[in-house]
């Protein structure tokens, strides 16, 4: 370090204001003001100083590494967040909305901001040389999400999605943490399943945090902070318990701070014990703290082992108390709970790779499926918008029909009050059923629509008549007289076709019928002409998770197959030379369910309009039957498909 005067010094080619602790550009006019002495200015001009303009020219990123540990000991550093893009650039986090490139990594480091005339802003940070130890207070970090880790995904009545991360219950519909010992949650899940899930996963971390005297709780898994979104910067402070001095025991608490002084990142939640202070400037917060620090602050005299010991000791005591309290609640409610629980609970596994790609909330089951399938953000947003429009159409249509039934009792307030109990319950039930239908059908409908487009594009021109009776289309030889595909090697063609016609067939790349013997399941085809001219039969199959059809299992194994997967599909049978039959089906047609979903409402057989001349009790029963019919799974499913076709045709006409 070369001292120019009492204020300025040159450190490894950098001119530094040692009073304000910042680098100064040698070309800046303020340099001459700080060096009124000509000898000092001449001394400075003889130094080999860093050209700031080269920083921007030599780098396509705003974050530039500098190999000078001595420099960073004499300048102020602030904590900033950056994005590493797929094109290799590093940019400041706040301008992400202007980007077209995918964010590969999120990182944070302590750095110093430099303003370059005509070139904008860059941030310099210490770039370590070999065998150098990190500078005190400087450490890069990024949220490190393990893509192979799996988490419990709890689905309640199809439409409510929860995941558990290190004992914290996160509600994906609202991006909100829930206490497990919550009356509304217990009512939503049902007591029996609530108790079972608690014993299996014990998601009581938020309950523990609210019960601690400490205002923090350490978490190792970065995915929780990734999903919770907005984070705050914090540091640990020593305090005396109960605010006393002298012999009072030492205590650690977390305090929000500036990025320059922060040691950890955290997620802040309001203290539920003081809800009235939520809007107060001095409201009390508790913090879920990322265990890994963002800086190694050697200047601080805090011992992190003591901090972790404080939390562990206190949390173990609180955990036992909470477990005992919840067990008591379970025992008391079980004795007096005689009602049958109707809620449908499903527990699956979801990978952190899928959860890490969630871009916005709320999150539905369909969204998770699309992410798992590798669909991009724009495609998922289009599907979500389509789902919202379909749901709106179905709800408006069903609600209008239910309102017409409800209006029947306007003249009888007592009967209307009695009917309203069933009415509002039906509204809740059919909305749940719509969520199930969306999960069952939406992806299939979109897939069939895409297949239809592909089929029309691929096969619209591939037709050639060999004779008035035989047509070649979609890779098949079609017998128009018998309305069926025929084997190109069929001996009958020797008498039905002339030599030049058979030669024409031999030169065409037609499907080889022996290849059909390799398949046990029906074969999906995008063959518009084939299905147009060939006779089709109705056949029952099973629809798999891959949306393809499979042959029905044997009678011995039939009970293991989900009833809701059985579908009825039109197909073209092909008799092979070994007398076995193979089936071809149109992949662009939506198969009809033979049986409703296991969660579906049973369809009523009633129909038609109600007669106002009925006795009040009979009229009430008829209204209930009509309402059950309109909210049945099969009826809502037909409405959903009709709404999809309406939107599809509307877009086509546009």
From Swiss-Prot:
Q: Region entry ORC interacting region (OIR): which residue ranges?
A: 449-587
Q: Where in the cell is it found?
A: Nucleus; Chromosome, Centromere
**InterPro entries for the chain:** ORC1-binding_dom (IPR037240), Sir1_ORC-binding (IPR021646)
List the transmembrane segments: none
Keywords attached to this Swiss-Prot or TrEMBL record, sorted alphabetically, are: Centromere, Chromosome, Nucleus, Repressor, Transcription, Transcription regulation
Region Sufficient for interaction with SIR4: what ranges? Answer: 322-654
Query: Which Pfam families is this protein grouped with?
Result: Sir1
Taxonomy, superkingdom: Eukaryota
Is-annotated flag, keyword Transport? no
Cellular component GO terms held in the UniProt record: chromosome, centromeric region; nucleus
Q: Oligomeric state and partners?
A: Interacts (via OIR domain) with ORC1 (via BAH domain). Interacts with SIR4. Interacts with CAC1.
Q: What does this protein do?
A: Involved in the establishment, but not the maintenance, of heterochromatic silencing at the cryptic mating-type loci HMR and HML. Is recruited by interacting with the ORC1 subunit of the origin recognition complex (ORC), which binds to HML-I or HMR-E silencers, DNA elements that direct the formation of silent chromatin at the mating-type loci. Establishes transcriptional silencing by recruiting the three other SIR proteins, SIR2, SIR3, and SIR4, that function directly in silenced chromatin and establish repression. Also found in centromeric chromatin.
Q: What is this protein called?
A: Regulatory protein SIR1
Originating organism: Saccharomyces cerevisiae (strain YJM789)
């Amino acid at each position: 370090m070369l001292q120019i005067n009492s204020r300025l010094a040159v450190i490894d080619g950098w001119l530094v204001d040692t009073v304000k602790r910042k680098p100064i550009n040698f070309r800046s006019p303020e340099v001459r003001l700080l060096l009124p002495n000509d000898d000092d200015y001449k001394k400075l001009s003889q130094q080999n100083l860093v050209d700031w303009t080269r920083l921007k020219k030599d780098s396509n990123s705003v974050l530039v590494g500098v190999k000078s540990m001595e420099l960073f000991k004499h300048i102020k550093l602030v904590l900033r967040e950056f994005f590493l893009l797929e094109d290799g650039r590093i940019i400041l986090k706040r301008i992400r909305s202007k980007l077209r490139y995918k964010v590969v990594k999120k990182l944070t480091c302590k750095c110093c901001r430099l303003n370059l005339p005509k070139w904008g802003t860059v941030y310099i940070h210490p770039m370590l040389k070999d065998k150098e130890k990190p500078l005190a207070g400087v450490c890069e970090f990024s949220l490190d999400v393990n893509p192979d880790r799996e988490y419990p995904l709890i689905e309640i009545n199809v439409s409510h999605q929860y995941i558990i991360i290190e004992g914290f219950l996160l509600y994906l519909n609202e991006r909100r943490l829930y206490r497990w010992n919550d009356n509304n949650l217990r009512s939503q899940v049902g007591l029996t399943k609530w108790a079972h899930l608690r014993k299996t996963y014990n998601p009581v971390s938020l309950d523990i945090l609210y019960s601690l005297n400490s205002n923090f709780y350490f978490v190792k898994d970065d995915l929780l902070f990734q999903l919770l979104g907005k984070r705050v910067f914090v540091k640990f402070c020593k305090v005396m318990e109960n605010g006393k001095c002298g012999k009072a025991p030492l205590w650690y608490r977390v305090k929000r701070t500036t990025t320059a002084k922060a040691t950890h990142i955290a997620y802040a939640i309001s203290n539920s014990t003081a809800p009235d202070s939520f809007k107060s400037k001095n409201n009390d917060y508790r913090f879920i703290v990322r265990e890994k620090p963002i800086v190694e602050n050697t200047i601080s005299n805090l011992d992190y082992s003591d901090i972790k010991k404080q939390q562990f000791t206190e949390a173990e005591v609180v955990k036992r108390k909470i477990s005992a309290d919840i067990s008591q609640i379970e025992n008391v409610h079980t004795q007096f709970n005689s009602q049958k629980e109707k809620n449908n609970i499903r527990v699956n596994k979801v990978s952190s790779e899928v959860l890490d790609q969630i871009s916005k909330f709320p999150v539905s089951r369909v969204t998770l499926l699309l992410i798992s399938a590798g669909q991009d953000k724009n495609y998922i947003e289009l599907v979500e918008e389509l789902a919202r429009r379909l749901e709106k159409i179905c709800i408006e249509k069903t609600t209008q029909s239910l309102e017409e039934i409800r209006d029947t009792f306007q003249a009888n307030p007592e009967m209307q009050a009695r009917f309203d109990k069933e009415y509002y319950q039906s509204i809740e039930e059919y909305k749940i059923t719509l969520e199930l239908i969306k999960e069952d059908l939406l992806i299939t409908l979109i897939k069939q629509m895409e297949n239809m487009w592909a089929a029309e594009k691929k096969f619209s021109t591939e037709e050639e008549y060999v004779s008035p009776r035989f047509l070649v289309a979609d890779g098949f030889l079609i017998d128009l007289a018998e309305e069926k595909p025929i084997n190109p090697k069929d001996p009958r063609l020797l008498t039905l076709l002339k030599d030049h016609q058979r030669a024409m067939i031999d030169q065409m790349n037609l499907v080889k019928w022996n290849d059909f013997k390799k398949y046990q399941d029906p074969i999906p085809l995008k063959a518009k002409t084939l299905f147009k001219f060939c006779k089709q039969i109705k056949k029952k199959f099973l629809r798999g998770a891959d949306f393809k059809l499979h042959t029905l299992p044997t009678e011995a194994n039939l009970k293991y197959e989900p009833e809701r997967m059985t579908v009825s599909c039109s197909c073209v049978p092909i008799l092979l030379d070994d007398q076995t039959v193979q089936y071809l089906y149109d992949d662009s047609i939506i198969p009809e369910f033979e049986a409703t979903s296991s969660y579906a409402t049973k369809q009523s057989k009633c129909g038609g309009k109600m007669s106002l001349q009925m006795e009040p009790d009979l009229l009430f029963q008829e209204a209930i039957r009509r309402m059950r019919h309109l909210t049945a799974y099969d009826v809502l499913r037909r409405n959903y498909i009709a709404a999809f076709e309406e939107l599809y045709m509307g877009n086509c006409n546009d």
